[in-house]
Curated annotation (Swiss-Prot):
The organism of origin for this protein: Saccharomyces cerevisiae (strain ATCC 204508 / S288c) (Baker's yeast)
Additional remark text: Present with 5440 molecules/cell in log phase SD medium.
GO molecular function: ATP binding; magnesium ion binding; phenylalanine-tRNA ligase activity; sequence-specific mRNA binding
Subunit: Tetramer of two alpha and two beta subunits.
Keyword list, A-Z: Aminoacyl-tRNA synthetase, ATP-binding, Cytoplasm, Ligase, Magnesium, Metal-binding, Nucleotide-binding, Protein biosynthesis
Domain B5: 292-370
Keyword Cytoplasm listed: yes
Main localization of the protein described in the UniProt heading: cytoplasm
This protein's name: Phenylalanine--tRNA ligase beta subunit
Gene3D superfamilies according to UniProt: 3.30.56.10, Bira Bifunctional Protein, Domain 2 (3.30.930.10), Phenylalanyl-trna Synthetase, Chain B, domain 3 (3.50.40.10)
Organism phylogeny: Eukaryota, Fungi, Dikarya, Ascomycota, Saccharomycotina
Cofactor: Mg(2+)
Length: 595
């Protein structure tokens, strides 16, 4: 949970009341925050202004600054209405070049026109950017933001990807001009290691660097590292251009919405933002940014009441939701449905359960019925289907006297490929961009490395060693927005003086029998219904030649059979790579086919 420090008296002034420490602690608890510390006593000794340190939910990005905290608490206390965020007419453009697809493909922008900041609001503006960078932006790897004095630069603005040597500018708080490659060297120096140097790894290996320039080709920023000294903002800046670059479009839009909604209150026309026309013709992403259109989500009144043990009317639930910045009206077609209007400041609302939770907060957790009055509320959790399948694998394996192990999901690149006699073509495993140690370089694509490392650490135990694991592996997929996906696997190994292939095949048979999947002889030709069989397969070099097989599965009558796993006798070279001086057989199956 992020911790936000706010000026105590400033917050109480915004709330219109001076709370005691206990009163404010109770208010935070009721709202869903936690007061971590009140520095009043320390401040009296040092002569500084007292601060409150608040623990915020990780998905409530609108609460990462004093502006958002005070606005949300005032709405919760019914002292203020939800702001109506508006857009004025655009006056400039951000043109995105196709070359940016090589490194950070998404960009967006907005203008805070005629803004008036003081020392405290300016500090809050900078602090919010730091909090967003550290949390939602994943230390600038997903999203980076820059702010510029619009009066010092001229639009339209261009977002390009250029070779490092072609980029020249004076970076923020410096007096010397650098090229892109020289700037990387500068920020990798020991003096900058804990500052901007923390983000150098994001772009340093790329042949091109992202850069935002104005109409006169003056560099505004080199995301995700540094802004230009030329466009530096100050407390006296009246017009601020906000630029966002990202590898994730959704998160980029969230960051822009949070920054603009939180600080547009200081504009001459409060809560009004000047949009920027985003021109991105190469990928069809041209649009006006930001987008302040509210989302509408439908939720069942019965669902909310059943979860909370209440019998609230539509108006009563709407009143609770209003305290949490959500406006709701009852559907005219279906009286059980509420149309909930979700503002751009609440990207954390993703499902009806989020609305139900806010209704509970608005109603008051301490006011919820207790004891016998909860007869219509069900608190027994329902397992996800894949977890239910995983538990079946665990029970069946344990009944067969195998012991479950829980290795780490990360492993070294060699353990995932070279040690298993496999090659890496670059499109299979997710690699960590900046691994702390050589032992944690990639996310595993098979359960075998972790199991073999477990066997290695327990090789002094009596033989045979029979262990299994049910866990996730991860594969890259460029077709998906997140570029990767999880897949639940089950795997088991038999380690002894003999390979024990017949034993591992027997375990596979028990697992399949547990899932009502019968063995089909003659490579699946003996029957046309649901079942499984194995076929010899020498393509997996992890196994001894002629001792590897693929597991084939037909889910139902007439269905096309498909490979769901593999088994075999592990190659002696694989065993020696993991310092295990015994023979072994291994089986691994995709558990998701049984959903």
């Amino acid at each position: 949970m992020p911790t936000v420090s706010v000026n105590k008296q400033q917050l109480f002034d915004l709330l219109g009341k001076n709370y005691t420490s206990q009163e404010f602690d109770e208010l935070c608890f009721e709202f869903g925050m936690e007061m971590d510390e009140d520095t009043t006593e320390e401040a009296l000794k040092t002569g500084e202004e007292p601060e409150l340190k608040l623990d915020i939910s990780a998905n409530r990005y609108d609460l990462l600054c004093i502006e958002g905290i005070s606005q949300s608490l005032n709405e919760y206390l019914e002292r203020k209405e939800r702001p109506d965020y508006k857009l004025s007419k655009p006056t400039t453009k951000l043109i995105i070049d196709k070359s940016t697809e090589q490194i950070r493909p998404f960009a967006t922008a907005a203008v805070l026109r005629n803004i008036k900041l003081n020392e405290k609001s300016y500090a809050s503006f900078i602090a919010l950017q730091d909090k967003l960078h550290a949390n939602l932006c994943r230390n600038r790897s997903l999203v980076a933001m820059g702010t510029h004095d619009l009066d010092s630069i001229e639009g339209p603005f261009h977002y390009r990807a250029l070779p490092p040597k072609d980029i020249k500018f004076v970076p923020l708080n410096q007096t010397q001009e650098f090229t892109g490659d020289k700037l990387i060297e500068f920020y990798k120096s020991p003096e900058q290691k804990n500052n901007i140097g923390r983000y150098v790894h994001i772009i340093e290996d790329s042949p091109v660097f992202p850069v935002i320039m104005d109409s006169k080709d003056r560099v505004c920023s080199l995301p995700p590292l540094i802004n230009s000294e030329h466009s530096k903002i100050s407390v006296n800046t009246r017009n601020i251009l906000i630029d966002i670059t990202a590898t994730d479009k959704t998160k980029a839009e969230i960051v822009l919405n949070i920054l603009t909604t939180m600080f547009s209150r200081y504009c001459d026309e409060p809560f009004t933002v000047e949009p920027v026309e985003i021109v991105s013709e190469h990928n069809g992403q041209s649009r006006l940014a930001p987008n302040f259109n509210d989302r509408i989500m439908d939720v069942s009144i019965k669902y909310i009441n059943s979860c909370l043990g209440l019998d609230q009317s539509a108006d009563e639930i709407a009143h609770c939701l209003k305290k949490m910045s959500l406006h709701a009206v009852q559907s005219k077609e279906d009286k059980d449905i509420l149309h909930v209007d979700i503002p751009v400041t609440r990207p954390d609302i993703l499902h009806a359960c989020d609305i139900m939770e806010d209704a509970a907060v608005g109603y008051g957790f301490n006011n919820l019925p207790k004891g016998e009055k909860l007869s219509n509320a069900n608190f027994i959790a329902k397992p996800l289907p894949i977890n239910k399948v995983s538990d079946i694998f665990r029970v069946a394996s344990s009944q067969a006297t195998w012991v479950e192990v829980l290795p780490l999901t990360l492993c070294s690149h060699d353990e995932n490929f070279k040690f298993l006699r496999q090659s890496d073509n670059g499109d299979l495993a997710v690699k960590l961009a900046n691994p702390k140690t050589l032992e944690y370089q990639v996310v595993r694509t098979t359960l075998l490395p972790g199991i073999l490392k477990t066997v290695k650490e327990n090789r002094k135990h009596s033989l045979p060693i029979k262990v299994f694991e049910t866990g996730d592996v991860v594969f890259k997929d460029d077709k998906l927005e997140r570029k990767a996906y999880n897949e639940r696997h089950w795997a088991a190994i038999y380690v002894g003086k003999n390979s024990g292939f017949e034993i591992i095949q027997g375990l596979l048979g028990k697992i399949m029998q547990t899932f009502r999947t019968e063995w089909i002889a003659d490579y699946g030709a003996a029957a046309s219904g649901r079942g499984y069989w194995i076929e010899e397969d020498d393509s997996v070099k992890t196994y001894f030649p002629g001792r590897g097989a693929k597991v084939m599965f037909r889910s139902k009558e007439g269905a096309e059979p498909k490979q769901i796993g593999h088994l075999g006798v592990l190659h002696p070279e694989v065993m020696m790579n993991f310092d295990v001086p015994f023979a072994a057989s291994f089986v691994e199956v995709n558990a998701e086919v049984f959903l």
